[in-house]
Amino acid sequence: SIFKDLYEQKNFRGMKRDAMRAACIWIACWKHGCPRTSNEIADIFHIDKNSASLGCSSAEELLQSHERTMEQQDKSKLCSLKPSTFIERFSSRLELTVEQQLLAKFIAHQVEKKELIPDNRPQAIAAGILYFVSFYCKLPYSKMDIKLKLGDEASEVTINKCFKKLNEYKTLLLPSWVHSKYGASGSSSSGGKNNRKK
């Protein structure tokens, strides 16, 4: 098993047992189509984020090492990670309405389809999308609120960068009903105004 192999690897003997167990669960989640970030795994196992990140990276390296000589069809198939992967469960932390969740999913799919933000991690893009939705749906969440509620999956700076990029495509990403319902004008390109706290 991955856990046994991790435990026996000299390079990983400084790793805590909980981090090794967490890493194995992380791999299992990816293999079964329900990926979790190392930060989410850290929260589940109540371990520090650095230990979780180290454990997950080590487990991934070990898996790749073990499967290097295998035929492609026999290798573990880890599901792909996309912004839409995170939207539903990230949305639940913000208590978005069903309508707002569907809007966030629509935006995520558009971003993926057209590769609008190629330079950021999927979870960071998801955080940016949720701030974008929050901003245009007049929700009381600042970038710091999003950062904290999503467990530090993205920094305020990264969320703002993603927001700015999304804002460049707001005519593509925002259906007309958003403007009708919320009066979304998009007058602020940085997302720093709109009567929300910072």
Regions found by a protein language model. Give the residues of each.
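A cyclin-like helical interaction fold
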Residues: 1-22, 26-119, 144, 150, ...
